[in-house]
Amino acid sequence: MRKVTSLAVLFAALAAASAFAFDPAELNKITFQNSTGARIETIFLSPSDSEYWGPDIIGADFVIKDGGSLGYYIHYPEKTFKFDIMATDEAGHMFEVYNYVLTDGKESTITFTQKNLNSKAPEFTFATLKVTNNTDHEVQYLFISPEDSDAWGVDLLDEESTLTAGDTHSIVIPIGKDKVTYNLMAADENNDEYVFDLTIDPAKGKDFKASIEAEDLKPAKGE
């Protein structure tokens, strides 16, 4: 979904060879707490330098219950970076903030309340992307970010979840009529990175599949 102006989403991830392994020390943490009295059903956390919202970070099969919380790790290229955040609850209320600043070394917490979920949520049309881990390794981080951003953004597996070999993670993506490209990166328990291109065309339906394969592994330094 295009931010503010229109619904427009498609999916594709761009791969680029790198000489360096993934470094978890580069991640910052953000925690979302639900004090609304209702279930939080979607959270979008998108780099502010992108015009697109990107995937729902909670996932197709999960919600944040009242009184609950979820923490996520975020990857961005600078000491500070701005993100746009939108959340919706089961009653159709919306929390929205733009240009929220994250700073290296400082954990952030956002608490959703009845007071700050005071707007009507937009009418989304969603596609579901099922990502399967077809490697022999446990995927510990999964990033999907709009191609027009310099940041990888948020790890869609949250702070406690992983994607073991053979397992599938379902991701909800708001879609419109246009194609939009995203970058996808997975990192395993060895901090090896897997990247590949993927395009989801809204004209072809609302259900899509992708798999992380051994051949998606980035080459090691010097290869």
Provide a role label for each language-model segment:
Residues 79-90, 178-190:
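A short, solvent-exposed beta-strand micro-motif common in secreted/extracellular proteins
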Residues 38-42, 137-141:
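Short acidic/proline- and small/hydrophobic-mixed sequence motifs that coincide with surface turns
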Residues 1-8:
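Bacterial N-terminal signal peptides that target proteins for export
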Residues 8-16:
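Bacterial N-terminal signal peptides
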Residues 51-78, 150-177:
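Intrinsically disordered, low-complexity Pro/Gly/Ser/Thr-rich segments with frequent PxxP/GP/PP motifs
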Residues 94-124, 192-223:
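Extracellular beta-sheet/turn segments enriched in Thr/Pro/Gly and aliphatic residues
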Residues 17-23:
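Sec/Tat signal peptide C-region and signal peptidase I cleavage site
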